[in-house]
């Protein structure tokens, strides 16, 4: 059994903010199971890797012996979370919400232990609230406090409409914490306001206020906007293994480290060691393959990951990469050769500077994988297929 301090350090990994750290540490020191709440509104039928960042954190609490509550916001989904929106969301029908709800529990159990997870829906208690209950609940918060929210404030200042029911959303989400007597609530950084409303309402109802733990929002495949099905930059956890593997391999080398930090269960010391090796010349593609294999194994199986890896290799050989090239041997005086030098000596570009320029333009690939690092070095003993543009190829071995 680990100490409360060790448990706290494990919980803290990957968290953006804990409100308040001393409160959480004190509660962990009580050595009693805490009630950990995580809510999801079933606004779409599928869970993607972005959702799993906070689900992994919930699983962490579960592994430490705490009571985890997977709350399906079937009522609040019909309101629509206004967080980050510059217009009023169209409310979903109950039929759509219930259809989406069917898949959420099954998908969540790919991460959570079903035997140790309490699943509940907030319609259970919200549907029982009467009109006077809602009026009293609304009286606990002022319009001025609501307008402290960045999204509401921007809409107010730009004279964009804010519907009254949107003000109810954070109040009802906060009331969920009262109904569940939550000790800790988890959420993305964009949910901070809503989570803090839960703290305030618990105080109002005479409960010990929950601690709040926020986790980062995972960037989508584009590396810019947060992962979202509506932006088509997502990886769904129920996608076929080959598709999941290929999507992971398509992310940039820099984004790969972000995915390792937020999605991988590997120790940070191991990830940091790989990062150092890449900075010294190791091909980041090799590290990315390990990430793809880990994620496919988690959501499918080890066998599926092996097949997906082979499918990925075969696809590039079949559709993009020639296999009948004579191998060119280039001698490294030290332990490696730089990418610019290899491209120039292999006849793929006229000068080293042209090679670096082509890398910056995204026109250089190694074994079908786009190169982004102009300082990439290939160690002695490795053989790869280099590509510039669509038609220039060379098979090179560094000796």
Swiss-Prot record:
Record key words, sorted: Aminoacyl-tRNA synthetase, ATP-binding, Cytoplasm, Ligase, Nucleotide-binding, Protein biosynthesis, RNA-binding
Native species: Coxiella burnetii (strain RSA 493 / Nine Mile phase I)
Binding-site residues for ATP, renumbered to this chain: 229
- Any Pfam family: tRNA-synt_1b
What is this protein's record name?
A: Tyrosine--tRNA ligase
Matching Gene3D superfamilies, A to Z?
A: HUPs, RNA-binding S4 domain, Tyrosyl-Transfer RNA Synthetase
Biological process terms in GO annotation = tRNA aminoacylation; tyrosyl-tRNA aminoacylation
Task: Relate the assembly described in the record.
Answer: Homodimer.
Known EC number: 6.1.1.1
